């Protein structure tokens, strides 16, 4: 046993001596030249591949949002020093060669590169810049590869979101921020960069836009050059999907410009608008603006609340057509019967009209906006059925759009109604709605009684242009008969033809609409604030078969403009005119538009020469172009 122990000790000693000798030969003699440029790092480094965030396009394919990636490039001074010795040139000469290779291929100059390389001799690795774009990086890498230059390393630095039209649809599109996901087991990295949506569409569709990380294994030689090596693994990144919106950027611009103009003219605190196709639920424009938006950085505006889905207002008299809808759908009123209007007392409260109208038919109750008349009709409907009708129209709940920040509005449960709630709700008091809710409800009046699910994204594509998801029009429910909806729409047409909105009547298209003026509720919902109003208008065109439903409102317009007929309705008309006279508009026939063109010169200010020519050609104007483009 003792001799076996001695043998083991002897064998172990011999092996130790051989291993030590082998290590000495490798480090001192270096027969395989591991110290030269053929030496590589056999332990692969895992490089994270950052996906590009998806883009956003309008309904016409115009780019609204895109991303630019930036990379950081560094120079390994030790690798450059080895290379300089091998080439028998000074270190300064080597730095000059590298500086020239970088400077001529990106925005930073050769002089700036050289300054950074020579600024601090104690640094082994020097950061040159972290603002190199992808195309610039490709040129720099090609230059280094072509001339076998040493020391260059690069890594992803950041991504910038580009909103190509700045303020346009800013609140709707939303914003992003850079975040780190922390430690990732697969890539074994601790700081995984990504842009994450924080509001608007950027937040709502973040999982589609964000993409998926990838990684690849890389090895380097002694001069920190990437080397080909067999059996390296990788998982390619997956770029984010692209959103193709229902929003028409041209219509969106028309709406926003009209609202900004209205804010100035009417002295309002905020304004909002929604335009929908009532037959599909497509949202053609969604805009919310405040007076100071244009003075702010667009990035600040993008994080502000999306007014059409978050701002609540009492709908006022624009609720009257929907109360009438509830009555007509149950055959509780006859078109030719009369209701005594003027003054009416309910539970000690006085309901009155702005004028002593006497007896009015249902159509005149809507066209003249009689509070008394609609309150009496609401009594026929009853609390239960009016409540159920308004719930079915979508009030007190979100629309199904699922847009970040959307409010469900305020609509009391039936159990909480008192003896006066039926009457106040009938003319739009005691409840609060969003512009989107209101537009969705009136789409049912426009399309024969169907509540359409509103949507903003038409389809989604991958980075190869393949459609991965498409939104199809969806009927959520039938809320009334077609006959009831058509009758209410004819009553709304009477509002424009001979009622409270005759000043927006057009010769070239029929308009159905309803004005509304609502006092602003005090904080906590108890009582109203003196002199504070919301001006509202709901309109649809053409009246006989609407292709467009629009809701406009102003928050606290100045006295005199607080009536819906004096601010919201004129804004509706301005927007309508500008949309109908846009090239390729199919809402009204070309020959009908020519009728109006003889009366009104289109606004061409700020238009590109080609766009201006297209508009003038469509009008049939003769014109002469002078000066440069």
State each model region's role:
Residues 1-296, 384-394, 504-507, 524, ...:
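Periplasmic/cell-envelope proteins involved in peptidoglycan metabolism and beta-lactam response
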Residues 4, 47, 312-313, 364, ...:
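A generic secondary-structure micro-motif detector
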């Amino acid at each position: 046993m003792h001799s076996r122990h001695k043998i083991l000790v002897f064998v172990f000693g011999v092996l130790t001596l051989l291993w030590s000798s082998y290590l000495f030969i490798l480090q001192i003699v270096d027969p395989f030249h591991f110290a030269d440029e053929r030496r590589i790092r056999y332990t692969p480094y895992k490089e994270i591949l950052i996906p590009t965030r998806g883009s956003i396009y309008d309904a016409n394919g115009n780019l609204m949002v895109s991303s630019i990636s930036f990379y950081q490039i560094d120079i390994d001074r030790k690798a450059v020093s080895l290379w300089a010795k091998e080439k028998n040139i000074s270190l300064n000469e080597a730095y000059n060669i590298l500086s020239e290779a970088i400077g001529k291929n990106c925005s930073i100059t050769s002089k700036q590169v050289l300054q950074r390389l020579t600024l601090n001799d104690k640094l082994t690795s020097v950061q040159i810049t972290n603002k190199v774009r992808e195309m610039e990086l490709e040129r720099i890498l090609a230059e280094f590869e072509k001339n076998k230059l040493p020391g260059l390393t690069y890594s992803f630095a950041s991504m910038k979101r580009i909103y190509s039209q700045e303020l346009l649809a800013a609140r709707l599109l939303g914003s992003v921020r850079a975040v780190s996901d922390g430690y990732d087991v697969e890539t074994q990295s601790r700081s995984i960069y990504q842009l994450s949506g924080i509001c608007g569409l950027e937040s709502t569709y973040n999982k589609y836009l964000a993409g998926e990380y990838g990684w690849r294994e890389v090895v380097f030689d002694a001069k920190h050059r990437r080397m080909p090596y067999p059996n390296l693994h990788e998982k390619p990144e997956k770029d984010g999907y692209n959103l193709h919106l229902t929003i028409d950027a041209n219509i969106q611009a028309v709406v926003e410009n009209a609202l900004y103009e209205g804010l100035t003219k009417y002295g309002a605190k905020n304004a909002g608008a929604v335009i929908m196709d009532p037959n599909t639920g497509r949202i053609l424009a969604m805009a919310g603006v405040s007076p100071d938006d244009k003075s702010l950085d667009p990035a600040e505006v993008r994080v502000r609340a999306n007014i059409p889905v978050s701002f609540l207002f009492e709908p006022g008299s624009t609720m009257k057509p929907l109360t009438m809808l509830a009555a007509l759908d149950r055959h509780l009123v006859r078109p030719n019967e009369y209701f005594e209007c003027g003054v009416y007392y309910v539970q000690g409260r006085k309901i009155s009209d702005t004028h002593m109208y006497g007896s009015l038919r249902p159509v005149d109750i809507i066209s003249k906006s009689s509070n008394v008349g609609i309150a009496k009709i609401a009594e026929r409907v009853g609390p239960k059925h009016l409540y159920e009708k308004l719930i079915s129209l979508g009030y007190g709940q979100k629309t199904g759009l699922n847009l970040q920040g959307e409010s469900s509005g305020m609509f009391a449960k039936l159990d909480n109604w008192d003896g006066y709630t039926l009457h106040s709700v009938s003319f739009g008091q005691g409840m609060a709605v969003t512009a989107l809710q209101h537009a969705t409800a009136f789409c049912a009046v426009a399309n024969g009684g169907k509540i359409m699910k509103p949507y903003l994204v038409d389809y989604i594509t991958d980075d190869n242009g393949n459609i991965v998801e498409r939104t199809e029009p969806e009927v959520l429910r039938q809320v009334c008969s077609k006959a009831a909806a058509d009758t209410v729409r004819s009553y709304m047409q009477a509002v424009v033809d001979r009622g409270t909105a005759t000043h927006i009547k057009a010769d070239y298209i029929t308009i159905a609409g309803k004005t509304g003026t609502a006092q602003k509720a005090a904080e906590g919902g108890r009582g109203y604030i003196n002199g504070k109003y919301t001006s509202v208008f709901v309109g649809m065109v053409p009246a006989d078969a609407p292709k467009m439903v629009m809701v406009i409102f102003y928050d606290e317009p100045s006295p005199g403009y607080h009536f819906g007929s004096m601010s919201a309705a004129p804004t509706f008309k301005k927007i309508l005119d500008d949309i109908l006279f846009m090239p390729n508009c199919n809402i009204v026939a070309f020959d009908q538009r020519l009728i109006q063109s003889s009366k009104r010169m289109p606004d061409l200010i700020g238009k590109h020469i080609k766009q201006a020519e297209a508009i003038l050609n469509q009008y049939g104007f003769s014109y002469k172009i002078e000066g440069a483009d």
